Amino acid sequence: MSLIVSDRFRIVVGLGKSGMSLVRFLANQGVSFAVADTRENPPELATLRRDYPQVEVRCGELDVDFLCRADELYVSPGLALATPALQQAHARGVKLSGDIELFARYAKAPVIAITGSNAKSTVTTLVGEMAAAAGKRVAVGGNLGTPALDLLSDEVELYVMELSSFQLETTDQLNAEVATVLNISEDHMDRYSGLPAYHLAKHRIFRGARQVVVNGQDALSRPLIGEGLPCWTFGLNKPDFHGFGLREENGEKYLAFQFENLMPVRELKVRGAHNQANALAALALGHAVGLPFDAMLASLREFTGLEHRCQWLREHDGVHYYNDSKATNVGAALAAIEGLGSDIDGKLVLIAGGDGKGADFSGLRAPVARHCRAAVLLGRDAELIAQALGDAVPLLRVDTVQAAVEHSAKLAQCGDAVLLSPACASLDMFKNYEERGRVFAQAVECLS
């Protein structure tokens, strides 16, 4: 049975990955719709014309009168709701919605909903692996991998969804079984008026949630709504009731729940305090939906991390090389610098820079001074980072990732680690952060 009123007209705005999933979904529901995109040649245009030749599509500047033919616009997350044409249509009574709102209406199985400025892909993947190890028929996606609407199936027993602030802007009621904001730090300041607006967008994830998971060391992760809901916490401190954290016994550090040690930290294959926090967050989310500890701990012991996320590449001349190209904001870079820096015997040589998206880099100064031997800077906002770091460590400016690797190898000493953690987006020099990470990995491989 369709939950969409079929005699109304919709327009899908944005023909990328999520937009195409909306097209497939609406077509299967028998709904009348059209498509619009600000780009002249959007990524999925050929697919749309091949599979749905009857669907009207408008490319280029958005036509407000065309948009106002619809009762509802399904806006892809890549397009800001502040876009004038969307605002004008909304002012004339057209509802703005998105794919996650539709997903929430149709999903029959419980949903674990995960957002945060950093670590959401790692935690989402890890929880999905835990659920699979527990024998659940689990579907994992959203902002990560498969679009939400493509995951819908009566066979699914549990959904694990990574959600971005952009997706949550068009989601009124998610109704997750358990929801979390892993952490909040400045990101996408080129799209938001400031941190409060970004914070409010993230916290839409808690609307209708039955349980919440809170980062006990980040006050901004605590829900603005939902007092009285079951609440589980995680953090790198000693846990108390309903809490996941770290306990120390006889010189050994353990992942723990309440007053019980679960497993030694040394058994994790991923290094750094930030990865310990990710493991604890995943345990809290899994526990909230009843996943058994034996399956969750077995998954933790096997988890080797995700590509481009503080990923160990190789050891060369006593120096370890880590690819954290996914660190596209200051908060992510801070997590890697603090987490890895406190976990190695030597110092870090940091490679950073790119498109800062209007971020404030001043928060990097203290941890860089504490954990780094030097910083090698590149990209559009290298000078802004240099100004923020001041005289905290020696600075070197280069033009390419290859040069950054070569100079970092000379600066590093035995026992050190070279860390690519840019604190910036990659689009000033690369197609995406994945390409940046691959170029870095290739340069590291070429060291001899």
From Swiss-Prot:
Annotated Gene Ontology cellular component terms: cytoplasm
Residues the record lists as binding ATP: 116-122
Signal peptide: none
Keywords: ATP-binding, Cell cycle, Cell division, Cell shape, Cell wall biogenesis/degradation, Cytoplasm, Ligase, Nucleotide-binding, Peptidoglycan synthesis
Keyword Oxidoreductase: no
GO BP: cell division; cell wall organization; peptidoglycan biosynthetic process; regulation of cell shape
GO molecular function, a single term: ATP binding
Catalytic activity of the protein: UDP-N-acetyl-alpha-D-muramoyl-L-alanine + D-glutamate + ATP = UDP-N-acetyl-alpha-D-muramoyl-L-alanyl-D-glutamate + ADP + phosphate + H(+)
Presence of the UniProt keyword Cell division in the record: yes
Cell location: Cytoplasm
InterPro entries xref list: Mur-like_cat_sf, Mur_ligase_C, Mur_ligase_C_dom_sf, Mur_ligase_cen, MurD
The protein's annotated pathway: Cell wall biogenesis; peptidoglycan biosynthesis
Tree of life domain: Bacteria
Main location: cytoplasm
The protein's Enzyme Commission number: 6.3.2.9
Functional summary from the UniProt entry: Cell wall formation. Catalyzes the addition of glutamate to the nucleotide precursor UDP-N-acetylmuramoyl-L-alanine (UMA).
PANTHER family attached to this UniProt entry: UDP-N-ACETYLMURAMOYLALANINE--D-GLUTAMATE LIGASE
UniProt family annotation: Belongs to the MurCDEF family.
Name of the protein this chain belongs to: UDP-N-acetylmuramoylalanine--D-glutamate ligase
Provenance organism: Pseudomonas syringae pv. syringae (strain B728a)
Gene that specifies this protein: murD
